[in-house]
Amino acid sequence: MAAPKAEGEDKPKRVRKSRAKPKPETKEVKKPKSKEFCTADDSSDDYNEVKPSPAMIALMAVKEIPESEDVPDKSDSEAEAPVPAIVKKRRTPPKKAESSDDKKLDEATGEQVIDEDALSKLTIQTLKGMCKTRNLKISGNKAALVQRLIEADGIAHIIPTTATVVQKVKKTKRPAVFSKVDSELKLIPCPGREHMLMDEATGLVFLDEDPSTAVGFIEHGEVFGLDSEHMTVCKNMGIRYSWTEDYLC
C-alpha cells in the first residue's frame, strides 16, 4: 500500500529558465583570395567572387593606354598657367552735369556776371546777403532786391572799385617824361582858364593866387583833378598839392 502524499507534493514544481540569450549560429564564410594568390586547388566559385582592388584597376588602366599616345601632365600645365593678378579699379566720382543755373563769368574780366533769371531763383535771405556784401539796402521785396543787384552790377562794370584802382596804381610805372622833369617849374597862363597857371613839362595846374600848390593837371585842353601819377610827381618834386571841385569849376 502506497504511503499518503504530504500536502503540497501533488503540485508541479516551477523550473527557473535561464535568462541567457541563445547564441546565433554563425556560418563560416570563406574569404575570397586575390587573383595573385589563387592556387589550382581553389574552387572556381571563389575565383569568380574576387573583386579587383583600386590599385589593380589603376594598373590595368595604365597598361591599356598605348605608348605612342602623349598624355598631358596636369602638374606641368597647372604650374605653367599664370595666376591672374587682381587689379583694383579706382572709383572715379561722377561728373556733375553742367546746368544752366551755373555761374556765368565775364570773358574779359573773369568776374561773375549777375543774371536776372539766376537771381530770381534765389531766396530772399540769399539776395539780402548779396546786397550786404555790396553795401546795398536790404529792404524791399524780392523783385526790388533783384533790381538793386542788377543795377549795382552794371555800375560796378563802369566804375571800378577802390581796390581795383589801388592795384592799378601800384602796377603803373612812372613815365619817362616825369623822371626827366626839373625841380624848377615854368608856369604860363592856362588856356581857357584865366585864374589858373600851368607847367608845360608836367602838365600840373596851379591857381594864380597860390602858384606853389598844384590843384590838377591839363590834358588835351581839359583840366582834371589830380590822379595818382601826378600826385607822385608832386611828391618827387616837393610840390604841395590839393584838389577841390571848386577850383575846377
UniProtKB/Swiss-Prot annotation:
Residues 1-110 are annotated as: Disordered. It comes from the Viruses. Residues 1-12, 22-38, 95-107 have a biased composition (Basic and acidic residues). InterPro entries: SAP_dom, SAP_dom_sf. SMART domains: SAP. Residues 119-153 form the SAP domain. Pfam families: SAP. This is Putative SAP domain-containing protein 049L.
